[in-house]
A protein has these predicted regions:
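Short catalytic/metal-binding and nucleic-acid-binding patches
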Residues: 1-158
Length: 158
């Protein structure tokens, strides 16, 4: 049997604990719409949102600058301070684990909640930051055009 090594989407040799602004996207497993609609989050969506809002209290100096919980994914701008002792993989991994644990407490038998890994982009300058901030801000309005939106009139994912 042949086993393949999955290529890491991270930049080789980059220190992901370094002081920077990061644009993060985390998708649900198979892009299932678990989190409700953008304007009315489900119970699972509320859990995902609450955990995002608590990140800064779990990690000293880390902050979530802008975020949106969408039906099947989450976008955020995560700011890591200088002298930070956690790397991005630890933070995102623990976030995903915490949300999964809470969801399984509500609905036992729930298997995978999240897609493997996550997407990241290192924000390079003010223009990059502004474009990403606007993208996150506009994401709920653009949901009705998404191929995973079942009802373009209401934006419902269910």
């Amino acid at each position: 049997m042949v086993y393949y090594t999955r290529k890491s989407p991270r930049i080789p040799m980059y220190d992901y604990s370094s002081c920077n602004y990061y644009f993060i996207t985390i998708c649900t497993h198979n892009k299932l719409c678990l989190f409700g609609s953008p304007d009315h989050l489900s119970e699972f969506g509320q859990i995902a949102k609450a955990h995002l809002e608590q990140l800064s209290s779990h990690y000293d100096g880390i902050s979530v600058d802008k975020y949106v919980v969408m039906p099947n994914h989450i976008h955020m701008i995560l700011i890591l301070p200088s002298g930070n002792q956690y790397d991005l993989n630890q933070i995102i991994g623990q976030y995903k684990s915490g949300v999964t644990r809470m969801i399984r407490n509500i609905q036992s038998g729930t298997e995978a909640v999240w897609q493997r890994s996550y997407h990241d982009h290192i924000i390079r300058n003010q223009k990059d930051y502004e474009m990403i901030w606007l993208y996150i801000h506009s994401n709920p309005a653009n949901w009705k055009k998404d191929c995973f939106c079942n009802d373009p009139l209401t934006g419902s994912a269910l």
